[in-house]
UniProtKB/Swiss-Prot annotation:
Binds 2 manganese ions. Its EC number is 5.4.2.7. SUPFAM superfamilies: Alkaline phosphatase-like, DeoB insert domain-like. This is Phosphopentomutase. It is found in: Cytoplasm. Mn(2+) 2 binds at residues 298, 303, 351. It comes from Streptococcus sanguinis (strain SK36). Belongs to the phosphopentomutase family. The gene is deoB. GO terms for cellular component: cytosol. Gene3D superfamilies: Alkaline Phosphatase, subunit A, Phosphopentomutase.
Length: 403
């Protein structure tokens, strides 16, 4: 019988808590990540008021220097630590896959200067459409259609762009490039990006509608992902008949592998929390695991190097934690963590190689305090032990520390 009937894992996308030991092996605009510190720099430069995470123990996490504006609790309400990544990457898929027990020794490719001409030419030859070269770089999905949508409406050219993650995205006006054609082009792009030098995690169809100055992306987005190369703890749970709920982009990150209840994409962090609360209240969800990703920290503020917006986003999420806890059952466990860093005060616009925080709370827990510093996959090893399934490739359970 499991110690906790339900475990809920919330990933605050990109909320790192200080440079990892190997951070200098990773760079941003030519600057090594060794001085990056997402939470530390936000707390120091613009102030951070997150009383609910502080109460669990966020300010108590072992660091070279305490978080400037997050107090340390004498009697925290939960357990806390920080975790180190072992995989060779600092992107979303690598972080999430490692959290679920995989060691990624061959990272996906990212294209900070846009995709090579060879890929664009192959897509042009397959589709019979030209590619707008000026869009071929990391771009905001809404900005890229504002900037190049009018041209696409006139010429029928493809808008191909990327991001900090290993993705190739194709935006197409639905009245100019029909959905079925867009999907066919994306399937081809998927077929030519399955190995180096262009090993990509996802190809994303990004259809939109509207007129210049008033474009909106539609719900007809489609992701062409790759499944994890080995079974994750999600797969182990699913094979054992245990419920696995995904909220936000989790289903995309794992290409649906091991997930038996997908709750859909988030419109915002708040919408994601609403969806999680809906799962918490679900009478049919008696036992199992929920996995939520909240991406606004990363997508809206980290990459845009906006520390004020990032702080506000953290405070907004923190204010929802009492609602999450209120809807937890006595035998539920909540874990709040991240998947990498994205220091909004740092050089460049890429993710940063950092430790991630881990906060653990359960109504049935009488103990509290520090869990030894471990690795990302310790999360899934703990989940696996709780539900009586095998862990994946790596990870050490801390279930016995939770009393």
């Amino acid at each position: 019988m499991p110690k906790f009937n339900r475990i809920h894992l919330v990933v605050m996308d990109s909320v790192g808590i200080g440079a990892a030991p190997d951070a200098n092996n990773f760079v941003n605009a030519g600057v090594p990540d060794g001085a990056s510190d997402t939470l530390g720099h936000i707390s120091k430069t613009v102030g951070l008021n997150v009383p609910n995470m502080a109460k669990i123990g966020l300010g108590n996490i072992e660091r070279p220097a305490p978080l400037k504006t997050v107090p340390q609790e004498e009697n925290p309400s939960g357990y806390y630590t920080k975790l180190e990544e072992v995989s060779l990457g600092k992107d979303t898929m690598t972080g999430h896959w490692e959290i679920m027990g995989l060691n990624i020794t061959e990272p996906f490719d990212t294209f900070w200067n846009g995709f090579p001409e060879e890929i664009l030419t192959q897509i042009e030859e397959f589709s019979g459409r030209k590619v707008i070269r000026e869009a071929n770089k990391p771009y905001s999905g809404t900005a890229v259609i504002d900037d190049f949508g009018p041209r696409q409406m006139e010429t029928g050219e493809l808008i191909i762009y990327t991001s900090a993650d290993p993705v190739l995205q194709i935006a197409a006006h639905e009245e100019v490039i029909p959905l079925e054609e867009l999907y066919r082009i994306c399937e081809f792009a998927r077929s030519i990006t399955l190995e180096r030098p262009a090993l990509l995690g996802r190809i994303i169809a990004r259809p939109y509608v509207g007129e210049p100055g008033n474009f909106t992306r539609t719900a007809n987005r489609h992701d062409y992902a790759v499944s994890p190369f080995n079974p994750t703890v999600l797969d182990k749970l699913n094979e054992a008949g245990i419920a696995t709920y995904s909220v936000g982009k989790i289903n995309d990150i794992f290409n649906g592998a091991g997930i038996n209840h997908d709750m859909g994409h988030n419109k915002s962090n708040n919408h994601g929390v609403d969806t999680l609360v809906k799962a918490l209240k679900d009478d049919n969800f008696k036992e199992g695991f929920s996995f939520t990703n909240l991406v606004d920290f990363d997508a809206l503020y980290g990459h845009r190097r906006d520390p004020h917006g990032y702080r506000d986003c953290l405070e907004e999420f923190d204010a929802r934690i009492p609602e999450i806890i209120k809807n937890m059952r006595e035998d539920d466990l909540l874990m709040i963590t991240a998947d990498h860093g994205n220091d909004p005060t740092y050089a460049g616009t890429d993710h940063t190689r950092e430790y991630i925080p881990l906060l653990v709370f359960g109504k049935s827990l009488s103990g509290q305090g520090h869990i030894p510093v471990g690795h990302f996959a310790d999360i899934s090893a703990t989940i696996a032990e709780n539900f009586g399934v095998d862990k994946a490739m790596i990870g050490e359970s801390f279930l016995d520390k939770l009393v």
